[in-house]
Structures are given as C-alpha cells and as structure tokens.
Design a protein with these regions (language model features):
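Short beta->alpha junction loops
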Residues: 1-4
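Flexible loop/turn connectors
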Residues: 9-109
Length: 109
C-alpha cells in the first residue's frame, strides 16, 4: 500500500465526516495521528481515534490513543489449535470468545 493510496483512502473517509476512526493496528493509528495533525484536525475535539491493537507506541502519542488490549500470544495459540483441529477433521466451535480490555485514553475522550 502506497502513501498515495493511504492519502486517498483517508480523504474518502474524511468526506463522510466520521465521529471516530478505528484502526486495525497500532502502527496505522500512530501514522494516522500524525497525518491528522498535519491536516490540523484536532483529536479528540474534531475526530476521535482508536486502535484494535494496543502497544507502547500508542500510549506515547499526544494525545495518547485508545486501544483494545488482548493477549496476542494466547489468541495466536488458540487460533493455531483450532486450525490444527480443522485439519484433523474435528468439529470446532463457530465462535471462540477471547478476553480483552478497552484502554480508554485521551484520543476518545
């Protein structure tokens, strides 16, 4: 994905005047925060920002970015076990609920 593609995607989203943007991961959220700052869009006053993956990167931004925190190792282990079960012809649950915590920081207040 090029910078131009990301810029085009952001412009298309901003044209819809969202209240909040939820990013797939910490790096995207971090880069988006920088781009919003460059565009003089104030977070959270004009637009809230959050990530589906938490890391130290997000707590160090200004404002700090809200995120979902989960045990990535446990999630990966569960996914691997389920995949092995499928490959072995075993039945697996249609839904597997994992624990998580929403970390509210300044970017969504």
């Amino acid at each position: 994905e090029s910078d131009e593609q990301r810029t085009d995607a952001l412009e298309a989203v901003l044209e819809q005047h969202p209240d909040c943007l939820l990013c797939c991961d910490d790096r995207i959220a971090f880069d988006l925060m920088r781009e919003l700052r460059n565009r003089h869009i104030r977070v959270p006053e004009q637009l809230r920002l959050a990530s589906l993956y938490d890391s130290e990167l997000l707590s160090g931004t200004t404002p700090a970015i809200s995120a979902v925190q989960f045990d990535a190792e446990r999630l990966g282990s569960t996914a691997c076990r389920m995949l092995l079960d499928v490959m072995a012809g075993k039945d697996i649950p249609l839904r597997q609920v994992q624990g998580y915590q929403v970390i509210l920081r300044e970017s969504t207040k």
